[in-house]
Protein backbone atom coordinates (compact mmCIF):
# COMPACT_ATOMS: atom_id res chain seq x y z
CA UNK A 1 0.00 0.00 0.00
CA UNK A 2 2.83 2.43 0.91
CA UNK A 3 4.63 2.00 -2.43
CA UNK A 4 1.89 3.96 -4.22
CA UNK A 5 2.32 7.73 -4.23
CA UNK A 6 -0.57 10.05 -3.47
CA UNK A 7 -2.30 10.63 -6.80
CA UNK A 8 -1.21 7.20 -8.05
CA UNK A 9 -3.46 4.28 -8.96
CA UNK A 10 -3.84 0.65 -7.96
CA UNK A 11 -5.32 -1.27 -10.90
CA UNK A 12 -6.02 -4.96 -11.35
CA UNK A 13 -8.36 -7.82 -12.16
CA UNK A 14 -9.24 -11.14 -10.58
CA UNK A 15 -12.08 -13.58 -10.21
CA UNK A 16 -14.90 -11.86 -8.35
CA UNK A 17 -15.12 -13.61 -5.00
CA UNK A 18 -18.88 -13.46 -4.58
CA UNK A 19 -19.54 -14.38 -8.21
CA UNK A 20 -17.24 -17.40 -7.97
CA UNK A 21 -18.74 -18.31 -4.58
CA UNK A 22 -22.20 -18.44 -6.18
CA UNK A 23 -20.79 -20.32 -9.20
CA UNK A 24 -19.52 -23.06 -6.87
CA UNK A 25 -22.42 -22.92 -4.43
CA UNK A 26 -23.65 -26.47 -5.17
CA UNK A 27 -20.15 -27.96 -5.50
CA UNK A 28 -18.54 -29.92 -2.65
CA UNK A 29 -15.03 -29.22 -1.40
CA UNK A 30 -12.57 -31.13 -3.59
CA UNK A 31 -14.94 -31.11 -6.57
CA UNK A 32 -15.22 -28.49 -9.27
CA UNK A 33 -16.37 -27.46 -12.71
CA UNK A 34 -14.63 -28.12 -16.02
CA UNK A 35 -14.98 -26.45 -19.40
CA UNK A 36 -14.00 -28.07 -22.70
CA UNK A 37 -13.56 -26.64 -26.17
CA UNK A 38 -16.12 -27.36 -28.85
CA UNK A 39 -19.72 -26.32 -29.36
CA UNK A 40 -21.19 -28.92 -27.00
CA UNK A 41 -18.66 -28.36 -24.17
CA UNK A 42 -18.45 -32.09 -23.44
CA UNK A 43 -15.61 -34.22 -22.13
CA UNK A 44 -14.83 -35.47 -25.64
CA UNK A 45 -13.20 -32.11 -26.27
CA UNK A 46 -9.96 -30.70 -24.86
CA UNK A 47 -10.08 -29.37 -21.32
CA UNK A 48 -9.46 -25.62 -21.43
CA UNK A 49 -10.28 -24.58 -17.86
CA UNK A 50 -11.15 -26.10 -14.52
CA UNK A 51 -11.87 -24.76 -11.06
CA UNK A 52 -11.69 -26.94 -7.95
CA UNK A 53 -13.32 -25.77 -4.73
CA UNK A 54 -10.95 -26.01 -1.74
CA UNK A 55 -13.12 -24.56 1.02
CA UNK A 56 -16.28 -25.64 2.80
CA UNK A 57 -17.65 -22.28 3.98
CA UNK A 58 -21.36 -21.81 3.38
CA UNK A 59 -21.46 -18.00 3.32
CA UNK A 60 -19.16 -15.05 2.64
CA UNK A 61 -19.22 -12.06 4.96
CA UNK A 62 -17.73 -8.64 4.27
CA UNK A 63 -14.87 -8.92 6.77
CA UNK A 64 -11.52 -10.66 7.28
CA UNK A 65 -13.22 -14.06 7.56
CA UNK A 66 -13.67 -13.99 3.77
CA UNK A 67 -9.96 -14.06 2.85
CA UNK A 68 -9.23 -17.79 3.09
CA UNK A 69 -11.49 -19.22 0.37
CA UNK A 70 -9.06 -21.24 -1.75
CA UNK A 71 -9.67 -22.49 -5.28
CA UNK A 72 -7.40 -24.36 -7.69
CA UNK A 73 -7.50 -23.17 -11.30
CA UNK A 74 -6.33 -25.11 -14.35
CA UNK A 75 -5.71 -23.00 -17.45
CA UNK A 76 -4.87 -24.70 -20.73
CA UNK A 77 -2.88 -21.73 -22.04
CA UNK A 78 -0.17 -22.47 -19.45
CA UNK A 79 -1.04 -26.16 -18.92
CA UNK A 80 -0.79 -25.74 -15.17
CA UNK A 81 -2.97 -25.77 -12.05
CA UNK A 82 -2.40 -23.00 -9.52
CA UNK A 83 -3.91 -21.91 -6.20
CA UNK A 84 -5.94 -18.70 -5.93
CA UNK A 85 -8.07 -17.14 -3.20
CA UNK A 86 -11.45 -15.51 -3.69
CA UNK A 87 -11.46 -11.72 -3.42
CA UNK A 88 -14.44 -10.24 -1.61
CA UNK A 89 -14.51 -6.85 -3.30
CA UNK A 90 -16.91 -5.30 -0.80
CA UNK A 91 -14.37 -6.09 1.92
CA UNK A 92 -11.49 -4.95 -0.32
CA UNK A 93 -13.21 -1.55 -0.67
CA UNK A 94 -13.07 -1.22 3.12
CA UNK A 95 -9.40 -2.22 3.30
CA UNK A 96 -8.40 0.14 0.50
CA UNK A 97 -10.26 3.08 2.04
CA UNK A 98 -8.59 2.36 5.37
CA UNK A 99 -5.19 2.66 3.67
CA UNK A 100 -5.79 5.90 1.81
CA UNK A 101 -7.39 4.75 -1.45
CA UNK A 102 -10.78 5.56 -2.94
CA UNK A 103 -12.72 4.67 -6.06
CA UNK A 104 -12.54 7.06 -8.99
CA UNK A 105 -15.11 9.85 -9.21
CA UNK A 106 -17.30 10.51 -12.25
CA UNK A 107 -14.89 12.99 -13.89
CA UNK A 108 -11.93 10.62 -13.51
CA UNK A 109 -13.96 7.75 -14.93
CA UNK A 110 -15.08 9.85 -17.88
CA UNK A 111 -11.45 10.66 -18.71
CA UNK A 112 -10.61 6.97 -19.11
CA UNK A 113 -13.87 5.89 -20.74
CA UNK A 114 -15.28 3.76 -17.92
CA UNK A 115 -18.60 3.89 -16.09
CA UNK A 116 -17.41 2.36 -12.84
CA UNK A 117 -14.26 2.17 -10.74
CA UNK A 118 -15.04 -1.50 -10.17
CA UNK A 119 -17.10 -3.68 -12.47
CA UNK A 120 -17.54 -7.09 -14.03
CA UNK A 121 -16.08 -8.28 -17.31
CA UNK A 122 -19.66 -8.99 -18.39
CA UNK A 123 -20.36 -5.25 -18.13
CA UNK A 124 -17.24 -4.47 -20.15
CA UNK A 125 -18.29 -6.98 -22.80
CA UNK A 126 -21.79 -5.50 -23.05
CA UNK A 127 -20.27 -2.02 -23.35
CA UNK A 128 -17.95 -3.30 -26.07
CA UNK A 129 -20.93 -4.68 -27.97
CA UNK A 130 -22.47 -1.20 -28.12
CA UNK A 131 -19.20 0.34 -29.29
CA UNK A 132 -17.74 -2.27 -31.60
CA UNK A 133 -19.45 -1.03 -34.77
CA UNK A 134 -18.57 2.62 -34.25
CA UNK A 135 -15.86 4.16 -36.41
CA UNK A 136 -13.87 5.24 -33.35
CA UNK A 137 -13.81 1.73 -31.89
CA UNK A 138 -13.24 -0.13 -35.17
CA UNK A 139 -10.53 -2.74 -34.62
CA UNK A 140 -10.00 -1.66 -31.03
CA UNK A 141 -11.15 -4.88 -29.35
CA UNK A 142 -9.29 -7.50 -31.37
CA UNK A 143 -10.83 -10.98 -31.05
CA UNK A 144 -12.88 -10.15 -27.94
CA UNK A 145 -16.08 -9.91 -29.96
CA UNK A 146 -15.72 -13.51 -31.16
CA UNK A 147 -15.23 -15.18 -27.78
CA UNK A 148 -16.66 -18.68 -27.51
CA UNK A 149 -19.38 -19.61 -25.04
CA UNK A 150 -16.76 -21.17 -22.76
CA UNK A 151 -14.45 -18.16 -22.96
CA UNK A 152 -17.34 -15.90 -21.99
CA UNK A 153 -18.21 -18.11 -19.03
CA UNK A 154 -14.64 -17.86 -17.74
CA UNK A 155 -14.28 -14.16 -18.50
CA UNK A 156 -17.55 -13.14 -16.87
CA UNK A 157 -16.37 -14.55 -13.54
CA UNK A 158 -13.82 -11.71 -13.40
CA UNK A 159 -13.91 -8.17 -12.07
CA UNK A 160 -11.66 -5.18 -12.73
CA UNK A 161 -10.85 -2.48 -10.17
CA UNK A 162 -9.20 0.95 -10.08
CA UNK A 163 -8.41 2.74 -6.81
CA UNK A 164 -6.73 6.13 -6.42
CA UNK A 165 -4.33 6.93 -3.57
CA UNK A 166 -5.50 10.14 -1.89
CA UNK A 167 -3.64 10.09 1.45
CA UNK A 168 -0.82 8.25 3.23
CA UNK A 169 -2.25 8.01 6.71
CA UNK A 170 -4.34 5.04 7.81
CA UNK A 171 -7.83 5.67 9.17
CA UNK A 172 -8.31 5.49 12.97
CA UNK A 173 -9.28 2.18 14.54
CA UNK A 174 -13.02 1.60 14.76
CA UNK A 175 -15.46 -1.28 14.88
CA UNK A 176 -16.53 -2.76 11.55
CA UNK A 177 -18.94 -5.66 11.20
CA UNK A 178 -18.48 -6.47 14.89
CA UNK A 179 -14.71 -6.90 14.53
CA UNK A 180 -12.04 -4.53 15.81
CA UNK A 181 -9.99 -3.12 12.94
CA UNK A 182 -6.72 -3.86 14.73
CA UNK A 183 -7.71 -7.51 15.12
CA UNK A 184 -8.81 -7.46 11.49
CA UNK A 185 -5.40 -6.18 10.38
CA UNK A 186 -3.56 -8.79 12.47
CA UNK A 187 -5.57 -11.65 11.00
CA UNK A 188 -5.06 -10.28 7.49
CA UNK A 189 -1.30 -9.96 8.09
CA UNK A 190 -1.13 -13.54 9.39
CA UNK A 191 -2.94 -14.79 6.29
CA UNK A 192 -0.53 -12.96 3.98
CA UNK A 193 2.47 -14.37 5.89
CA UNK A 194 1.12 -17.92 5.57
CA UNK A 195 0.38 -17.32 1.89
CA UNK A 196 3.99 -16.21 1.32
CA UNK A 197 5.23 -19.43 2.97
CA UNK A 198 2.91 -21.48 0.75
CA UNK A 199 4.22 -19.69 -2.35
CA UNK A 200 7.82 -20.49 -1.40
CA UNK A 201 6.95 -24.19 -1.19
Task: Please identify what each model-predicted range represents.
Residues 15-17, 108-109:
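An acidic- and aromatic-residue-enriched active-site/binding cleft used to recognize and process polar
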Residues 26-201:
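C-terminal lobe and adjacent flexible extensions of AdoMet/dcAdoMet transferase-like proteins
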Residues 3, 24-25:
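Short acidic, glycine/serine/threonine-rich loops at helix termini
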